[in-house]
């Protein structure tokens, strides 16, 4: 199982940060795993997408739910697929003149002990990826 948390403070407002990730199309600009996806359903605050996640050498077809709570948080969660669990939340907290974005990522792979060993090897890669997402979020946020 991969379970990671990373955070970063920004000099942007909560609204500016949320606008950068308020839809799955915008989130795909910073989350590279979402390069090839298809929106199956879209409404305010909820999008259902079909995606293919590449995990090292294995590809997982999955259906994801992208839920948003305006100016507070977003959640990308697997609702159907071969992975045992995929959950990524983005929480925006206001602290004085700065805002902090916290990313929580949780992935459980199938394949029993082999999946566990692969997840141990992949954990540093995913730590680097969510760090990169936080840096990209700063670049694409409109001031």
Give, region by region, the residue ranges found by the protein language model.
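A short, structured loop/turn motif at beta-sheet edges
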Residues: 11-14, 41-43, 67-72, 91-100
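Beta-strand/loop substructures that line and gate deep hydrophobic ligand-binding cavities in soluble
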Residues: 78-128
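Hydrophobic ligand-binding cavity/cleft-lining segments
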Residues: 1-44
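Glycine-rich portal/gate segments that line the openings of hydrophobic small-molecule binding cavities
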Residues: 28, 38-81, 132-143
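Beta-strand elements of well-folded, non-transmembrane domains
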Residues: 10-12, 53-57, 68-70, 82, ...
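Hydrophobic/aromatic beta-strand elements that line small-molecule binding cavities or substrate pockets
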Residues: 6-8, 61-67, 87-94, 105
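Short structured motifs
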Residues: 3-4, 34-36, 48-50, 73-75, ...
